[in-house]
Amino acid sequence: MLFARVVLFGCLGLGPVAGLRAAEERPAVARYTTKAAHDRDGIGKIYFGREIAQVMGHQGASWLERPERQTEERTDVLLDALALGPGEVVADIGAGSGYFSWRMAQKVGAQGVVYAVDIQQEMLDLLMSQMRRRQVGEIVRPVLGTVQDPKLPAESVDTILLVDVYHEFDFPYEMAQAMIRALKPGGRLVLVEYRGEDPAVPIKRLHKMTEAQVQRELAVHPVQFEKNIPTLPRQHILIFRKPRE
């Protein structure tokens, strides 16, 4: 949830702080529209009828590491659903504090690689400090991405994981294209998003997505929707796969 301009606790409504934007950001192309009167939790930029949400900044890292997160989100169940194996190459997009990077490193082991991608150097510095302390610094590789490109090697990754981050991309089309280029043939793109269909999920509206909306946005890219794993209490696990040929 941290692939970001600097905005503190955007999804909880705790108030934005002054933001930064990547230097290469270009004016919106035809696929995007804007509106001046927009949701206080959004940036006024519209994609497929959806307003893009504000993003949490590095000041919110402690919230990602809160002790109750596993109970609330059942992150252990998510990791089991991914079924990662030794030696796999995976990417954690919007890695933030490294909550999932560390856990995935334990799954892929010493022969595997975890690319921890974020656009905030401060977050990557914090993340790698924790990875070295947890003795997985040789497995987890920090990558400073941009708002349009995660900077991953082409056709190098088995699984790309995005946990509560896709809805905050300034350039969702460009990011999806770049991530798919980074996937090996047959690789998986996994989007975990709070369920927009469920009003009982206690998250701001713009920080949730329906399965239909995600499928609509990914349908324009060269991936195939595979399944929605309905095992989490609040979130979708949406699996897309890059064709093998």
List each language-model region with its residue ranges.
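Class I SAM-dependent transferase core
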Residues: E25-A91
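Class I SAM-dependent methyltransferase SAM/SAH-binding core
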Residues: A91-P150
